[in-house]
């Protein structure tokens, strides 16, 4: 079954590379049953006054629909301007009872009481992706039939080992 991860992170006042590179790397590193939801996928310049409200509503709907939120708050960008949108997305995830995984190389993020208690915290994207792959990855079958072993099958195996003694 496919699982989805919403990729929350800075967009406003960021370069194209700062917006896209980490999202592309994470998407490529997820297991094949994990799909990334990129909030930047449908952004465009518009003079329409409601654009910011539309973006916020789209992002909220994406956080509702996803299975997990991965939030990236790098120190270099936080020092220029905190990503208020990303903090909103973390709060949405928390209130929607979604697992939230936060990645930051900024000790202020790791020590902030609201962020510290809202999800799993990591210093690197690699560690976070590994954690997500474990949480959302599909179990591999180990039986000859191609199906996972039946519940309790391990107990029977253990009992047979004990009876040989």
How would you name each of these model-derived features?
Residues 1-140:
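Conserved catalytic or regulatory cores that recognize and/or transform ribose-phosphate-containing ligands
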Residues 5, 147-150:
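Short, intrinsically disordered, low-complexity terminal segments
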């Amino acid at each position: 079954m496919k699982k989805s991860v919403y990729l929350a992170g800075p967009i406003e006042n960021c370069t194209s590379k700062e917006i896209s590179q980490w999202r592309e790397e994470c998407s490529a590193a997820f297991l094949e049953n994990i799909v990334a939801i990129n909030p930047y996928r449908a952004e465009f310049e518009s003079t329409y006054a409601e654009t910011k409200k539309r973006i916020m509503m789209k992002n909220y709907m994406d956080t509702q629909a996803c299975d997990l939120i991965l939030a990236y708050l790098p120190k270099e960008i936080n020092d220029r301007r905190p990503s208020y949108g990303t903090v909103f997305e973390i709060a949405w995830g928390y209130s929607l009872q979604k697992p939230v995984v936060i990645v930051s190389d900024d000790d202020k993020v790791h020590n902030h009481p609201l962020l510290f208690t809202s999800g799993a915290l990591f210093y690197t994207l690699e560690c976070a992706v590994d954690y997500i792959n474990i949480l959302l990855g599909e179990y591999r079958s180990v039986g000859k039939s191609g199906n996972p072993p039946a519940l309790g099958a391990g107990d029977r195996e253990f009992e047979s080992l004990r009876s040989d003694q």
